């Protein structure tokens, strides 16, 4: 039987393939969540470029003294990625939550991005 890491990699590739097939050429809003921080990127897979990104590791957010591991930080990142995406000319995206459940920080980021002007 395949190793656990190999199975996770296969699942990750399968999810990416499904997203690309259903995206219809729209950029992808990718979310990465760690135990201490959350990151979001708007990626154009056709060109292989990152159009906008936001993270709790950015200097302005770190200087505020807040942790990046809570729902309020995810909400700030969601609004920030939406603002930067709209500035880059992106209105519609495909939400790529990876293997994370649509709950908690991931849900807060998605809802804040919708409020900020992105549609998915």
UniProtKB/Swiss-Prot annotation:
PANTHER family, A to Z: 39S RIBOSOMAL PROTEIN L18, MITOCHONDRIAL, LARGE RIBOSOMAL SUBUNIT PROTEIN UL18M
SUPFAM superfamilies: Translational machinery components
Organism: Gluconobacter oxydans (strain 621H) (Gluconobacter suboxydans)
Protein's gene: rplR
One BP term from GO: translation
Keyword NADP: no
Subunit details: Part of the 50S ribosomal subunit; part of the 5S rRNA/L5/L18/L25 subcomplex. Contacts the 5S and 23S rRNAs.
Name listed for the protein in its UniProt record: Large ribosomal subunit protein uL18
Superkingdom assignment: Bacteria
GO cellular-component term (any): cytosolic large ribosomal subunit
């Amino acid at each position: 039987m395949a190793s656990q890491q190999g199975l996770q990699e296969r699942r990750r590739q399968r999810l990416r393939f499904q997203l690309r097939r259903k995206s219809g050429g729209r950029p992808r809003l990718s979310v990465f969540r760690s135990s201490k921080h959350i990151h979001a990127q708007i990626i154009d897979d056709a060109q292989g470029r990152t159009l906008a990104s936001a993270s709790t590791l950015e200097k302005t957010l770190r200087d505020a003294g807040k942790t990046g591991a809570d729902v309020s930080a995810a909400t700030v990142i969601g609004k920030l990625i939406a603002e930067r995406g709209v500035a880059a000319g992106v209105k519609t995206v495909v939400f790529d939550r990876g293997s994370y459940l649509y709950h908690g920080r991931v849900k807060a980021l998605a809802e804040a991005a919708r409020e900020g002007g992105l549609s998915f």
